[in-house]
Amino acid sequence: MDKAKENDEKGINELTNWIDNQVNGTTGGNNNPTTSDLPSVAGETMPYYPDATFKKVAGTNLDDGLVIQDESGNEYVWIEVPKSLYANSSYNTETTTGDKKPSSSTDYDKIEYCLHKYTDYYRNGTKNTDTYYSDAATGLTSAQYTKLKQEVLKSIYENGGFWIGRYEAGVTTNRTESDGTPTVAPLSKAGTVEKPIYPYTYVTCSQAQTLTSKLSTGKSYNSSLMFGVQWDLVLKHIEVKEVAKGIALDTIQKALKSDSTGWGNYNDASFTINRGKYADWTNASLSTTWTPYNQTTSNNFVNVSSVKQVQSGSDGILLTTGASDECKKMNIYDLAGNVREFTLESTNDSDAPCADRGGISYMGGSRFPAFNRTFSYTMLGGRSYVGFRVSLFK
């Protein structure tokens, strides 16, 4: 009898999966987000495959960082944004209780208000805004910027999250100041000694947005730089998950906002390098030589055991993407340290309108923690210490 019941339940599950595939497009259905074998939390978060070419990375989950991979091997991590937050008076109230509660997925201003309240600790009173500044700064027209932002907010509201690159945007040939306009779409993979992937630097914010958008050309999903609110949501996501594991709230908040030395590539950090290559910074000048992680240089910034040593001043090392497993949280590599990352957030400063976030590897982890907001002189060209990260949504 138990066996018969088990077979019945198996049949029901298979039928449910078949129906889901037909409805959600995993076997040629429509363009709605696909869910298939991805875990979810009812009423809170519903991860989806951007399209049928993605698959789940084995062994990953919502508790430790759910990862998917596209057909080219690029990997993305799900950022949870609980759908229940919009009904919480702590987040939906401005003057009277619930006056900022969204009425639908297109109630964009109220959705954004709630997300700002939810991430208030990481906004930290910033005057930066997710508003259009110029075509030259963002790589988008005003209409395109507004449309993109609304689509992001709508998707987050409906699905309870979004995807970001597991790794910093990467490229197979290291860029230098003398390189011309970048044209190659970014990767989101871990580099190795044999196949190094370098942080995609010497790009402007507008170029980074244009490059990122190439990943979804002709696709049914969108690819973009993150807006400022998305970066803050990534930090909040890490906070919530770490607290759920028993980490004290104060401890994780400090690691995200005050001092990220313990989990990022900074000059005052020490950690084991597991793969890839590195280049030495000396007095904020980056070497043109990239050394395998298991070898040393005359500077001895990395010892014979592949352990990065503590540096001072403006010395340090720049890593290829995903080089150290100690420089990650929730399966997201190098959110703290290595290179700063462009966002579509505006500083409203005519000389430096584009906000970038995170740390820099020849500086300390308390000066440039993961939370850090700063700016780049976008109009003057790219820098060796500023890159970007891809966001996917549907």
Report the location of each language-model feature.
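Disulfide-stabilized, aromatic/cysteine-rich ligand-recognition loop
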Residues: 202-210, 222, 226, 321-327, ...
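Acidic glycine-/aspartate-rich tracts in secreted/extracellular proteins
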Residues: 82-86, 168-171, 344-350, 361, ...
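A signal for long, low-complexity, Ser/Thr/Asn-enriched, surface-exposed stalk/shaft
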Residues: 1-31
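Short, solvent-exposed loop/turn elements at domain surfaces
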Residues: 85-95, 171-177, 364-368
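Short aromatic-cysteine micro-motif
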Residues: 72-73, 104-334
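GGW-centered surface loops in extracellular recognition modules
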Residues: 29-89
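Active-site-proximal beta-strands of protease catalytic cores
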Residues: 336-344
